[in-house]
Amino acid sequence: GWYLRNDIIWAKNNPMPEAVKDRFAKAHEHIFLLSKSPKYKFFYEEVLEPYTEPLNRWGGDNFNDAGQEQTKYGEGLAKELGYSHQNKDGKGKNVRPNPNGRTRKDVWKLNTSSYAGAHFAVFPDTIPELAIKAGTEQGDIVLDPFMGSGTTAVMATRLGRKWMGIEMNEEYAEIIKDRTSQLEMF
C-alpha cells in the first residue's frame, strides 16, 4: 500500500472555463504526496518559499555592532540559534525561524501552462519541480505514470534526475518524444 503524506491543492489562477449551472466551476486539482513507507525522503529546505511582507517585518535585519543578528528570544535559545540576545539598547527583534524562507503550504496558487499540440491540462513546470526537489536527490529516478505532455520528464532532466514514464495515449507519446529528444540527457 501507500501512505498519504499530503493532499496538496493546486488552485488554478486561470482554469479552463466551464459552462455549468448546477455547481461551482472547478478551479483546482489534488496532488498527492505518497510514500511506500512511514519513513521517506523529504527535502523541505529545497522548496522553501519566501516570507510574506508581514513576516519580513516580524523578523530579521536587526544586527549588533559585531554584525550578528539579534533577537528577543531568551538568551539560551538565541545562543543555540546563533543569534545575540539583544542589542545595546536592550531591544531585539524576533528572528525568522529559517533565514532561507518558510515551509511551503499545501495550497499552491499557480497558472496552468500551455505547450503547442498538448492537451489542455498542462502542469506548470513549478509543480513537478517542487515535487522532484522535495522528494529526490540528483541521480535519483523519477517515475511519471501519467506523462501527458512530458513536463515531469523535462523538469527531472533539468534537475539532474533520471526518469521513466508511462503514457497510453499515442498522440501524447509523440509529444513526449518530441520534447524529450531536445533534452541533454546524462
Say what each PLM segment does:
Residues 1-180, 185:
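Core catalytic lobe of class I
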